[in-house]
């Protein structure tokens, strides 16, 4: 066996561990506001708003300038590169606005998925070229964590062993590069909800993917205490005729995590995966009420499940901004409670919160 060459200094490890803990402490989670320009275009066109720089800036300003009470539930915000350099109406950089509230700034660093040759329509994620230089710049410009998404799907022939191994290795390379540059890596091996598979199949595949991911992270000497995991919840496929209860989703999800994720990882921040806002909150709540030992913080890193109602309330009108902020504050508070297993639904959650947010072969 090769000699052990320490990759990170004790000071680097301490900083990374402290950042990771801050993001997920006391029921806090992450607002994923890292939609690419193309994805924001789809979101804005749904409310008949033009996809231009200023409209994207105004919308993100709406989210970032909500009532300070959201800091009880939001520990981190993931930016898209464009957002990292945008400012509020009065000239305050978004990065300063967020950091002044005690929220950690993150940045999406991958360059999207590309086809993986020799597979049945599977993909890998690009963006490793120049990543070290970009991470160093983002750290200097105020970011303290990063996100990289890999995508796998369940079908008769997928995920293949090749796709699992390739994506695990890419995630590990990314995580190692981030840590060398002072950024906490969020590792996101998303298994898409597309398909008619049952809960048991999703659990099996999730376990295989996470086991491969953590083997790769070990091979690449990634410091787990200074990292976070962003997995899918274990659910039946979107086209499955069987609808699972939050308790069934919780048991399958936590069982898969207990079998594969080392307890050194400080936090697991679930993606919403096209669930409705309310389903994402109910499932997270059930996960945190499960009578099984859970050595990690189990929280959220939601994009659509924190923003769908906000977008509808805003609809691009300046007069609607206060109402839209209220919607965001409400969803943030609900998920902050769910991350502690303390969410008690109060009857009807409103039509927008109950709408499925599923998008086939979702890409952003």
From Swiss-Prot:
<feature type="binding site">
    <location>
        <position position="56"/>
    </location>
    <ligand>
        <name>substrate</name>
    </ligand>
</feature>
<comment type="similarity">
    <text>Belongs to the class I fructose-bisphosphate aldolase family.</text>
</comment>
<feature type="active site" description="Schiff-base intermediate with dihydroxyacetone-P">
    <location>
        <position position="230"/>
    </location>
</feature>
<feature type="site" description="Necessary for preference for fructose 1,6-bisphosphate over fructose 1-phosphate">
    <location>
        <position position="364"/>
    </location>
</feature>
<dbReference type="Pfam" id="PF00274">
    <property type="entry name" value="Glycolytic"/>
</dbReference>
<dbReference type="InterPro" id="IPR013785">
    <property type="entry name" value="Aldolase_TIM"/>
</dbReference>
<comment type="pathway">
    <text>Carbohydrate degradation; glycolysis; D-glyceraldehyde 3-phosphate and glycerone phosphate from D-glucose: step 4/4.</text>
</comment>
<dbReference type="GO" id="GO:0004332">
    <property type="term" value="F:fructose-bisphosphate aldolase activity"/>
</dbReference>
<dbReference type="GO" id="GO:0006096">
    <property type="term" value="P:glycolytic process"/>
</dbReference>
<feature type="binding site">
    <location>
        <position position="147"/>
    </location>
    <ligand>
        <name>substrate</name>
    </ligand>
</feature>
<keyword id="KW-0704">Schiff base</keyword>
<protein>
    <recommendedName>
        <fullName>Fructose-bisphosphate aldolase, non-muscle type</fullName>
        <ecNumber>4.1.2.13</ecNumber>
    </recommendedName>
</protein>
<keyword id="KW-0456">Lyase</keyword>
<keyword id="KW-0324">Glycolysis</keyword>
<dbReference type="InterPro" id="IPR000741">
    <property type="entry name" value="FBA_I"/>
</dbReference>
<dbReference type="InterPro" id="IPR029768">
    <property type="entry name" value="Aldolase_I_AS"/>
</dbReference>
<comment type="subunit">
    <text>Homotetramer.</text>
</comment>
């Amino acid at each position: 066996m090769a000699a052990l060459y320490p990759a990170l200094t004790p000071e680097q490890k301490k900083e990374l561990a402290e950042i990771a803990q801050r993001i997920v402490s006391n029921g806090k989670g992450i607002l994923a506001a890292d939609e690419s320009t193309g994805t924001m275009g789809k979101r804005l066109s749904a409310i008949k708003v033009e996809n231009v720089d200023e409209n994207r800036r105004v919308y993100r300003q709406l989210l970032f300038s909500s009532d300070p009470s959201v800091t009880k539930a939001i520990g981190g915000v993931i930016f898209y590169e464009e957002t990292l350099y945008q400012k509020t109406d009065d000239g305050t950089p978004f990065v300063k606005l967020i950091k002044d509230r005690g929220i950690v700034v993150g940045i999406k660093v991958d360059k999207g998925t590309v086809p993986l040759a020799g597979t049945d329509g599977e993909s890998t994620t690009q963006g490793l070229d120049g990543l070290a230089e970009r991470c160093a710049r983002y750290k200097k410009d105020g970011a303290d964590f990063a996100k990289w998404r890999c995508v796998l799907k369940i079908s008769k022939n997928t995920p293949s062993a090749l796709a699992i191994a390739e994506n695990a290795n890419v995630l590990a390379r990314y995580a190692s590069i981030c840590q060398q540059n002072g950024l906490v890596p969020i590792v996101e091996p998303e298994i898409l909800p597309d398909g008619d598979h049952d809960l048991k199949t999703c659990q099996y595949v999730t376990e295989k993917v996470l086991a491969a991911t953590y083997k790769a992270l070990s091979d690449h000497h990634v410091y787990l205490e200074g990292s976070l995991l962003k997995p899918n919840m274990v659910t039946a496929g979107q086209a499955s005729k069987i609808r699972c209860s939050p308790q069934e989703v919780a048991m399958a999800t936590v069982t898969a995590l207990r079998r594969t994720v080392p307890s050194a990882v400080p936090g697991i921040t679930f993606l919403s995966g096209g669930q409705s806002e309310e389903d994402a909150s109910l499932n997270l709540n059930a996960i945190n009420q499960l009578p099984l030992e859970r050595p990690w913080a189990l929280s959220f890193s939601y994009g659509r499940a924190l923003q769908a109602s906000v977008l509808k309330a805003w609809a691009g009108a300046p007069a609607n901004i206060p109402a839209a902020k209220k919607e965001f504050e409400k969803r943030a508070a609900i998920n902050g409670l769910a991350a502690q297993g303390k969410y008690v639904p109060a009857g009807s959650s409103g039509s927008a919160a109950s709408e499925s947010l599923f998008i086939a072969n979702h890409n952003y």
